[in-house]
Amino acid sequence: MRVVILGSGVVGVASAWYLAQAGHEVTVIDRQPAPALETSAGNAGQISPGYAAPWAAPGVPLKAVKWMFQRHAPLAIRLDGSRYQLEWMWQMLRNCDMRHYQQNKSRMVRIAEYSRDCLKALREQTGIAYEGRQGGTLQLFRTAQQFESAAKDIAVLREAGVPYQLLEAAQLIEAEPALAASQHKLSGGLRLPNDETGDCQLFTQRLAEMAMAAGVHFRFNTPVDALLQDANQICGVQCGSERVTADAYVVALGSFSTELLNHIVKIPVYPLKGYSLTIPITDEKAAPLSTVLDETYKVAITRFDNRIRVGGMAEIVGFNTQLLPARRKTLEMVVRDLYPHGGDIGRATFWSGLRPMTPDGTPVVGRTPLKNLYLNTGHGTLGWTMACGSGQLLADIISGRTPAISADDLSVIRYLPGFYPAPVRALHGVNVG
């Protein structure tokens, strides 16, 4: 079967790889000159199935109000003038009760755990190297209340069979020795020993190279203007004056998926802006071993070979990718507080990207009402964590095979019929694809 994939981020490239492995003839189309140059370029670097959880959680609405008045708040909201943004936030608010939270977290953990297994199999099969580490991840609590509130997450982890360790403050340095300098500021932590880390952009680039060697055709510098529909199926992709045709079509355009699909199927995917710093390591012993997550500021600090990646925060501001100095200061503050001597912040690279988020936190993977149109988007802050599992799942669905995990509640069908009008982007004249 001929399959066209729109998007060459980690999700699109993983989809291409698994579809090619299933015997399909695959073409990937992207407006960028190379893979992983947008959202996959500078993410936090963590592969954390156990921490897969929706931003829509009990207590978040009240916290959001408090964060409005905090200098280093993990969440910021700026109205972009669209009804779509308001509707999306309302849908997110409706998912902030405990019932929805546990339901959403459970299915997010399901696909994330499966994805880690797929990544492990891929690594064993191909030997792909991406500065990965299998040292687990550690969520840090600064207050006793945060430590006690971890109970709701632990319940889901226990139900899903995810190994975990609840650590007292004195035990933190056993997992991360360099935290000795800041141990007195912490009340404890939740460690997930099976979690991993790695450079998402490097992984995507090397997987794309392997996909090319396996016969996948990449068409870069090719903006996508429209999907062409004929009755209940897609009949082509309009790229400038050219029409590209296939038997099946996959939209993996992250936050830009919504606009392209607007006249075909409504999906509630909205850009959640995030930031990162990439810092050269100056003292190996003062740097993290794996990933730590600061629960207070929602910031992750990840170790690559010779670099530290500090990423996090969320801004609901539309398609604005402006680098705000205040956000840089927050990232610098957190890494200085926890690892004051690990790297040279003066030589750090500052980055921002748009994470494609659904109101319930769960990605949109699988079939649509159109018989040959498939989606793989809406992974939010967990695109790297969920990429391989989503790609394998999609390849199984398109190939007519029974997936290894249940996919019934992952497709766009859970949002139909209809949703609400797509957003009008602040950045006009920029084609998707």
From Swiss-Prot:
Job of this protein: Oxidative deamination of D-amino acids.
Q: What class of enzyme is it?
A: oxidoreductase
CC cofactor: FAD
**Which GO terms of the cellular component aspect does the record hold?**
cytoplasm; plasma membrane
The GO terms describing molecular function are: D-amino-acid dehydrogenase activity
The source organism is Erwinia tasmaniensis (strain DSM 17950 / CFBP 7177 / CIP 109463 / NCPPB 4357 / Et1/99)
The record ties this protein, via Pfam families, to: DAO
- Reactions mediated catalytically: a D-alpha-amino acid + A + H2O = a 2-oxocarboxylate + AH2 + NH4(+)
User: EC?
Assistant: 1.4.99.-
Superkingdom classification of source: Bacteria
Which key words are in the record? Answer: FAD, Flavoprotein, Oxidoreductase
What is the protein name for this chain? Answer: D-amino acid dehydrogenase
Q: In which pathway does it act?
A: Amino-acid degradation; D-alanine degradation; NH(3) and pyruvate from D-alanine: step 1/1
A Gene Ontology biological process term: D-alanine catabolic process
InterPro entries recorded for this chain? DadA, FAD-dep_OxRdtase, FAD/NAD-bd_sf
Family membership, please give it. Answer: Belongs to the DadA oxidoreductase family.
Q: Which residues bind FAD?
A: 3-17
